[in-house]
A protein has these predicted regions:
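Acidic, polar-rich low-complexity tracts and alpha-helical solenoid repeat scaffolds
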Residues: 1-261
Length: 261
């Protein structure tokens, strides 16, 4: 943190550069369990970056921090505003977290599952992966029928990827695709599994099939264009004879700009 503070002392530092340094300092405060200081710094960065993407990125961080702290209604209100962000990634992340919070707040049940899940998310952010996994396991055991089942599997997959346990991560993602494939995290899980197969597990044919699945099952996903490009690349490297079914499917997946798949 001392290095970051020295960076802030550099003369004629641009506001956005200063904002990036302050954001890292705030992240460290979250990591070190000092949420109120982090909240204050995030607010300063937002105030100084109202007209650029950094402002929205930090608004998302601030909303997530409120979620970590259990202020679910407040966090959801901030996230709902961010769903209109010009950054597709920020808007998508805000939408997913807002829907997850809303789906659980609207239930006529205890808030304990959501509180536990938020705790696990904070531990994961703090790189306390083993502790996060313990909380997720406890949540699944204590509340086996809560609507967070697919979220729990997705968080476990992300933890195992960070732990370099890619095969185990793939199993969690496969469970989401098989059982919750058309729910909120369906496209996230499908794309993440395709990336694992493509770059970590060296299963190129399986990756190619999953990228194609993304185009047919989730045409409106933020991952669609990237999946199309990677499918084309793998198709060129690993060509196969099209089945009649695949030929019909690809008619609906042509890129409007190029009129080709």
């Amino acid at each position: 943190m001392a290095v970051l503070n020295k960076g802030l002392a550099i003369p004629r530092l641009k506001p956005e550069q200063a904002g990036m340094l302050k954001t890292e300092i705030a992240d460290i405060n979250v990591f070190n369990n000092d949420p109120w200081e982090a909240m204050l710094i995030y607010s300063q960065v937002i105030e100084d970056n109202k007209k650029n993407d950094l402002g929205d990125e930090v608004k998302l961080k601030k909303a997530k921090l409120g979620y970590y702290m259990g202020n679910f209604s407040w966090a959801k209100a901030q996230l709902d505003v961010l769903k209109a962000s010009t950054s597709k990634l920020t808007a998508n992340d805000a939408m997913e977290l807002s829907l997850m919070i809303g789906n659980n707040l609207n239930l006529d049940t205890t808030a304990i599952p959501l509180t536990m899940f938020a705790r696990a998310d904070l531990l994961f952010f703090q790189s306390k992966n083993q502790q996060a996994m313990v909380v997720l396991d406890s949540l699944g055991t204590l509340f086996p029928y809560n609507p967070l089942v697919d979220d729990i599997l997705f968080r476990k997959a992300k933890i195992e990827i960070q732990n370099n346990n890619d095969t185990l991560a793939a199993r969690y993602l496969e469970q989401i695709i098989d059982n919750f494939g058309y729910d909120l995290l369906g496209d996230d899980a499908l794309f993440m599994l395709a990336e694992l197969y493509n770059f970590k597990l060296n299963k190129k044919e399986e990756a190619k099939a999953l990228y194609l699945d993304m185009l047919t099952r989730h045409p409106g996903s933020i991952f669609t264009e990237e999946s199309r490009g990677k499918y084309r690349e793998l198709r060129n490297l690993y060509p196969d004879k099209k089945t009649e079914k695949e030929s019909k499917e690809t008619i609906f997946m042509e890129s409007p700009e190029t009129n080709e798949f």
